[in-house]
Structure formats: C-alpha cells, structure tokens
Amino acid sequence: MSKVPAALNPTEEDISLLLAAQTHIGTKNADKQMAPYIYKRRADGIHLLNIGKTWEKIVFAARILAAIENPADICVISGRQYGHRAVLKFAAQTGATAIAGRFTPGSFTNYITRSFKEPRVIVVTDPRVDHQAIREASYVNIPCISFVDSDSPLKFVDVAIPGNVRGRHSVGLLWWLLCRTVLRIKGGDLSVMPDMFFYRDPEEVEREAQEAAAAAQAAKETAEPTTEGAADVQADVPLAVAANLATETGNVDWSAEGAQDWAADGAAEQATSSWE
C-alpha cells in the first residue's frame, strides 16, 4: 500500500473504537482466501482479524470512492438489518445511493425494472447476505467493495475490508469510518458521532418514547395540583374565616371605612318589628 497523508493514519482513539466495537472478532470458521486478514486463532476457536489490515482497506476503499465525480454513482447496499441505518446515514452524508433492505433482483441487469440502476461502484455490508447484488454487479462489470468476516466468500469482491459484520456496533462503526475517511479525502469532515450509524431496535425506540412521555406526564401532574389546589382552597374559605385569618396575620386595615352600616340595619329592624 502506498503512503497516505498523516490525516488518514489511525489514531489511538480510532483503534480504541475498533476494539470497543469488537470489530476484530471473527467467527470459528475461516475461508482460505481470508487467511491474509486473520491475525490468529484463540483457544476457543474464534479467529481474530488484523485491525491494521482493516484500516488499510478502509483508506484504500475511501480513496476509490472519493475519486468518483458524481457521488450518486456510488451504490451502498445492506441486506443485513444491522446495516440499514448505516447505509442510509452514509448516503445522507456523502450523496450516495442507498439500498437498505431486500435487493430487487435485476436492479443492475434488467433495465425494464423500476429500480434499475447503473452505478460505477457498489459497497455492500455482507457478501453472504448481499450475494445477489454482488453477482449482478459482476455481470455488468461494476466494481464491488465489501466488508468481510473471517468466513466470508471473496468471489466477485474486488476490495475486501475485514471486520465483524455480525455485530450492530461493529457494522455501524465500519460504515462511519469509511464515511469519515471519504469526506476527509474530499476536504471535509464528519460531524456525526458513530452512534448515529448504529442499528436501533424499533421496539426499543418505541419503548424509550413511551417512557419519556410517561415521565413528562407524571411531572406535569405533580406540578399542577400545587397551583390549582391553592386556588380551590382560597375560593372555598368563608368570609368570616378569611377575616379571622387576616386579623391573626395582622393584614387588617383598621383605618378603612366599614362595608356595612350598622345604624341603618338597626333602624330597619325596628320598623319591621311586630311587637306594637
């Protein structure tokens, strides 16, 4: 591999992210073509991938993608569920065309289909899951970049990026690193955190939304009785009780004129008396 600018070299944080996301964890099975990318085999039979090779291939693939003038000619594909959000975020940041979910057969070979595309390069998440897209791309001479695991077949794959393609954090981080490297080569940078590329379970998202709504409703209910209750108490207090409260607290204005004419009330009572 040729020398690359210092900005594209991995930092300690990048290596820590790769290790934390378990990008180097492979499977118990290994394809013979993946031997150059396997670091060693653990005692429990799990193959460990070489993170240095992973970073080299990410930079190599990013340089290929950055060389394409029209980003829409890049087609990013993920049939695996953990990569759906990642390819959509990648397409939003770079302007590529995303296919998240089931790949429609004939999208690259049958021009009659509504989903027909003619990309210059495709990037897939898993060669086993996205085998239909890889095979069709080989029919029409479209280069293929793919993330591969220790047991992934490399048939029709032109650029293989070794990594764990079965973990939600690993898949999201690999797509995030590829997106960031492409933008850096083009002179920009990625301001989105890796968490935005991670897969999120719809049930988990809905549950979090319900919990947030319940917490907000509970906070609203606890705040309302303090004001409404005080208003109800003040409205139900009799006038005499209110006067007593005012007297006890010393808030009575003794210089003010009385609201009731006691002399007039006495005269009226004598006039209406029936004793005479």
UniProtKB/Swiss-Prot annotation:
Its main location: cytoplasm. Disulfide bonds: none annotated. One of its GO terms (biological process) is cytoplasmic translation. It is found in: Cytoplasm. GO terms for molecular function: structural constituent of ribosome. The keyword Glycoprotein does not apply. Residues 211-231 have a biased composition (Low complexity). Residues 209-233, 252-276 are annotated as: Disordered. Required for the assembly and/or stability of the 40S ribosomal subunit. Required for the processing of the 20S rRNA-precursor to mature 18S rRNA in a late step of the maturation of 40S ribosomal subunits. Belongs to the universal ribosomal protein uS2 family. This is Small ribosomal subunit protein uS2. The gene is RPS0.
